[in-house]
């Protein structure tokens, strides 16, 4: 007879030090002028307007050997738990436009107060495609696929790639993020050096970033700078212009890879 363990309930309150008001039309225009997709920015502002102050219940887990840590552990050591995270209106948000190829700086770090934008390279999950484009997305464990939707930035721990940030999925398209260990981290395979390095199988340059196991991965240098700015309350949107609504089932959704220009 199987014994079912009761869920352990934990309250996790994540909020930035200073909540800000919605950006003005002038700030919105400034942000868009720096390459941020208008639809993605509109979705971000609308989501914040509709959900600031809201609490989201999360399916999470505790580790038997370090119950007070947010570090991942093997499935055999996990105890199911629930957490509650609360969204406030942050000053810094991020949009990752997975419509764009990995060779574009598709990670947009956005200051909603000033309208300043900084762009970075970011990798997608191996299960989403081992080419320059991410074409498949899901909320499925062990798929190694990127999940679309809004995330709340959590705490930091020291992982395999150094400083690593937990992320809480806030929609049906990504609400298994914690259990899937979808986190923001740095990686050696992100940056122009990797793009221009030779693929040993072909002898030709990779012409793309490397791929993760489903996480958004920045370069190691940029992760050490960006993660401390986002932790505990920033909001991150994994975006694709053609798949946001379809992704809400949590099942795999896909698009064809864009044709190469001759």
Give residue ranges: language-model regions.
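A conserved hydrophobic position in a structured secondary element of the catalytic/binding core
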Residues: 218
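Positively charged n-region of N-terminal signal peptides that target proteins for export
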Residues: 1-4
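Bacterial N-terminal signal peptides
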Residues: 6-15
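Cell wall/extracellular polymer interaction/catalysis modules
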Residues: 21-213, 221-229, 234, 238-262
């Amino acid at each position: 007879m199987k014994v079912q363990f009761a869920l352990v309930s934990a309250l996790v309150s994540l909020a930035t030090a200073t909540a800000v008001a919605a950006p003005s039309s002038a700030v919105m225009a400034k942000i868009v002028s720096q390459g941020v997709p208008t639809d993605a920015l509109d979705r971000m502002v609308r989501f914040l307007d509709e959900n600031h102050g809201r609490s989201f219940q999360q399916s999470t887990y505790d580790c038997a050997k370090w119950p007070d840590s947010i570090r991942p552990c093997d499935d055999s050591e996990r105890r199911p738990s629930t957490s509650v995270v609360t969204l406030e209106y942050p000053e810094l948000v991020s949009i990752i436009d997975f419509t764009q190829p990995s060779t574009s700086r598709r990670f947009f770090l956005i200051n909603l107060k000033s309208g300043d934008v900084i762009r970075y390279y970011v990798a997608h999950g191996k299960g989403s495609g081992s080419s320059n484009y991410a074409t498949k997305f899901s909320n499925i464990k062990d798929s190694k696929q990127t999940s679309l939707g809004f995330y709340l930035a959590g705490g930091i721990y020291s992982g395999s790639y150094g400083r690593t940030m937990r992320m809480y999925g806030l929609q049906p398209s990504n609400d298994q993020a914690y259990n899937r260990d979808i986190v923001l981290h740095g990686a050696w395979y992100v940056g122009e050096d990797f793009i221009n390095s030779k693929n040993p199988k072909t002898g030709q340059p990779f012409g793309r970033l490397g791929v993760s196991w489903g996480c958004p991965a920045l370069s190691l240098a940029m992760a050490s700078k960006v993660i401390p700015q986002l932790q505990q309350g920033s909001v991150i949107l994994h975006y694709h212009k053609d798949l946001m609504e379809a992704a809400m089932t949590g099942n795999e959704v896909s698009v064809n890879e864009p044709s190469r220009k001759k």
